[in-house]
């Protein structure tokens, strides 16, 4: 089905290296989920509860109430995986993550050998994806990180492999629909595909037709869930009702760190506070089932941004810092937070053993932090380097750009914009890191060529 061209650079040594690296990557992921204890908390606990309810055939509910607080795709798919396996154990979810992670590595490799013929870029980027601490550790949590990255890798693969559009475009619409049902901001992703197509092909008619076809299929994929939400909540909710909730908590007069904050700590006028108290029944009702909050929160967030554009921009940059330049604290917090085995060891260790453990822990965390900062730095740098050419290409009928540049840049810019506006925290960098890995490899290749000319 794929039109494999001679440009695709598959050499025996490189293929052997990739297979060995793939096996090492899988073994590291399996080792992590079997040896590093963690507790599923907050969103991860909610996903497990939703998936368990699907497994038990009680529906997409929390505490017996219908809910659409988060995207439905991941917990629903996981619930059916539980049914297939006959249990709803956490280890089943973790093994599912490893399978998805393995498939993602294969897909990224296939994408890289189509994206570029440069060996250094292919194998540097693939090495980073296979061995990246984040991509190993997050197999340990019941969350959307591994799932959405798998879907996104398929979407990118379908963009770079050009075959019959009668098959290709519906497949893109299908997977983008799945991504939107996981993360609702992917409803805007058909525009990303259209921009990438336009910059490559410079055929406006084909670009518009492609956009329309992808958007239509995506909408058809989302439509049944939208209809379900209308039946349950009496209003149009395409995927979830937490966008206004997140938007307001991240953009209000009392927010100083650009991140989520408890409702009780967010600014609220007396009138708004009265509405909140009524909706939440003075704290007796969970925010996760209070779909009415979106209706009152979203206008308040928009109003605050209009009245405080400078403060909004400040929060946006703080969000980007928190997402891409705050190191890897999220790995400790989400993927290895069960400290009971360590606490038991600390009671019997000597002082020297405790010091050695603490030193090793800080050393490992320092290395992880440097990797994230390095990838993020090169990722942002590559966006900036290519920004001028891409902007000129958007308004030119003849200036085309290859996927090698547009795929990492446009996708990175898409996530950067989303996080700038809505919400940022370290674990949100997860799906972007594969684009940053490609950008890093491309930047290193540029540096190598520059040094050769000196």
Question: Where are these predicted regions, by residue range?
Answer:
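Extracytoplasmic catalytic/substrate-binding loops of multi-pass membrane glycan-assembly enzymes
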Residues: 36-50, 59-61, 65-80, 87-91, ...
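Membrane-interface anchor segments at the N-terminal boundary of transmembrane helices
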Residues: 92, 312-408
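Transmembrane-helix motifs of polytopic, lipid-linked glycan transferases
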Residues: 95-116, 154, 158, 381-385
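Membrane-interface transmembrane helices that cradle and orient dolichyl/undecaprenyl
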Residues: 114-116, 155-171, 198-201, 444, ...
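Membrane-proximal stem/loop segments at transmembrane-domain junctions that anchor or position
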Residues: 238-345
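Multi-pass, polyprenyl lipid-linked donor-dependent membrane glycosyltransferases
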Residues: 42, 69, 93-100, 124-154, ...
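Transmembrane-helix signature of polytopic, membrane-embedded enzymes
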Residues: 17, 92, 105-131, 149-150, ...
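Loop-to-helix entry region of an early transmembrane alpha helix in multi-pass inner-membrane enzymes
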Residues: 20-22, 72-76, 84-106, 123, ...
């Amino acid at each position: 089905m794929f039109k494999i061209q001679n440009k695709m650079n598959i050499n025996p040594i490189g293929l052997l290296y990739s297979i060995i690296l793939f096996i090492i990557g899988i073994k590291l992921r399996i080792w992590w989920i079997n040896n590093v204890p963690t507790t599923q908390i907050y969103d991860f606990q909610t996903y497990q509860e939703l998936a368990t309810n699907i497994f038990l055939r009680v529906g997409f509910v929390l505490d017996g109430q219908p809910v659409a607080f988060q995207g439905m795709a991941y917990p629903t798919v996981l619930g059916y995986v539980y049914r297939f396996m006959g249990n709803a154990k956490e280890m089943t979810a973790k093994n599912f993550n490893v399978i998805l992670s393995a498939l993602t590595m294969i897909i990224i490799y296939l994408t890289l050998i189509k994206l570029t013929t440069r060996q250094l870029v292919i194998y540097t980027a693939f090495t980073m994806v296979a061995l990246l601490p984040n991509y190993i550790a997050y197999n340990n949590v019941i969350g959307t990180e591994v799932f959405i990255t798998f879907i996104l890798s398929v979407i990118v693969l379908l963009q770079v492999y050009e075959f019959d559009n009668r098959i290709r475009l519906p497949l893109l619409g299908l997977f983008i629909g799945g991504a939107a049902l996981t993360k609702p901001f992917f409803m805007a992703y058909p525009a990303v595909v259209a921009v990438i197509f336009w910059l490559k092909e410079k055929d406006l008619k084909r670009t518009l037709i492609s956009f329309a076809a992808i958007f239509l299929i995506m909408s058809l994929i989302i439509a049944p869930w939208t209809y379900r939400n209308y039946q349950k909540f009496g209003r149009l909710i395409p995927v979830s009702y937490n966008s206004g909730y997140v938007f307001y908590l991240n953009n209000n007069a009392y927010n100083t760190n650009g991140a989520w904050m408890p409702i009780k700590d967010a600014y609220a006028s007396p009138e708004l506070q009265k509405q909140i108290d009524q909706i939440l029944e003075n704290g007796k009702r969970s925010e996760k089932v209070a779909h009415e909050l979106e209706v009152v929160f979203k206008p308040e967030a928009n109003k605050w941004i209009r009245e405080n554009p400078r403060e909004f921009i400040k929060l946006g940059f703080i969000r980007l810092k928190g997402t891409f330049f705050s190191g890897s604290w999220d790995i400790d917090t989400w993927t290895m937070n069960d400290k009971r085995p360590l606490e038991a060891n600390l009671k019997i260790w000597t002082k020297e053993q405790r010091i050695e453990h603490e030193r090793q822990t800080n050393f490992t965390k320092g290395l992880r932090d440097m990797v994230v900062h390095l990838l993020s730095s090169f990722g942002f740098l590559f966006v900036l380097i290519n920004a001028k050419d891409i902007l000129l290409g958007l308004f030119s009928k003849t200036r085309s750009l290859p996927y090698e540049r547009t795929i990492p840049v446009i996708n990175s810019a898409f996530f950067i914009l989303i996080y700038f506006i809505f919400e940022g925290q370290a674990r949100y960098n997860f799906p972007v890191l594969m684009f940053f890995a490609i950008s890093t490899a491309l930047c290193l290749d540029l540096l190598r060529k520059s040094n050769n000319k000196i």
